[in-house]
């Protein structure tokens, strides 16, 4: 089996509940979406990056591990594009007793369930309609898969948190519908974090909008946080 890796690097976690922790990032090539706010557009094509065998990729990852590595983060693109390879790479890392972390929009429940046994921490990104990448019919299908993946992660008792990227284009009524739907299938006790992530440098949301969106989530989940991307402020990759 082969895998296409765009890059491997050590940095600090710039997003979410593990914000600021030292992390080895394994960025895989390929993504099915073209969100307007994407900050890694060069990794979207599946033919980007470099092709390796699984053994070669495992050796490359091993050569970048340090005693202080807190976790290994599989990111993209979207790692589920190469789900079979991710499962093998993550299993290799788990055997070293290092936590594995998946960042994904969870666009396919079958691919997700194939990877899930080898993942410890799951960041599920729910896309909003204003992401400008699909029509309404395809958006509904995507959200259906993402919801199923959320349920699967919770049932499997993985550390699970939700991220929603918001911009000045985000409509509070659409955001509220998405949040209502999320908490119709899970309870607040089922997740480990809920992050509202504002875009940076493009269509940035106002503070008033961010507070409005925060107030929508708060009745469901009082530990909701608005968290910008740390790495963009400290010059990290």
Go through each PLM region and give its residues.
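Generic structural signal for well-ordered alpha-helical scaffold segments
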Residues: 13, 58-62, 151, 183
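Conserved AdoMet/S-adenosylmethionine-binding subsite of the radical SAM
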Residues: 81-224, 229-231, 235-237
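Short, flexible micro-motifs
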Residues: 17-19, 23, 78-80, 128
């Amino acid at each position: 089996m082969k895998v296409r890796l765009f890059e491997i690097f050590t940095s600090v976690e710039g997003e979410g509940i593990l914000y600021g922790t030292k992390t080895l990032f394994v960025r895989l090539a390929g993504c099915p979406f073209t969100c307007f706010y994407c900050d890694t557009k060069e990794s979207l094509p599946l033919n980007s990056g470099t092709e390796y065998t699984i053994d070669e990729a495992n050796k490359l990852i091993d050569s970048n591990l340090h005693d202080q590595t807190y976790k290994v983060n599989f990111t993209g693109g979207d790692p589920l594009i190469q789900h079979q390879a991710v499962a093998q790479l993550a299993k290799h890392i788990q055997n070293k007793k290092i936590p594995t972390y998946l960042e994904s929009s969870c666009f396919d429940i079958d691919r997700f369930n194939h990877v899930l046994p080898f993942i410890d921490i799951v960041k599920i990104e729910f896309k909003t309609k204003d992401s400008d990448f699909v029509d309404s019919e395809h958006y509904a299908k995507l959200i259906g898969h993402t919801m199923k993946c959320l349920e699967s992660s919770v049932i499997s008792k993985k550390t699970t948190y939700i991220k929603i990227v918001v911009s000045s284009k985000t409509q509070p009524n659409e955001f509220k519908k998405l949040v209502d739907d999320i908490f119709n299938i899970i309870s607040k006790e089922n997740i480990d974090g809920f992050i509202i992530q504002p875009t940076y440098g493009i269509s940035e949301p106002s503070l008033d909008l961010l507070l409005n969106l925060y107030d929508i989530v708060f009745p469901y989940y009082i530990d909701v946080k608005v968290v910008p991307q740390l790495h963009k402020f400290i010059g990290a990759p």
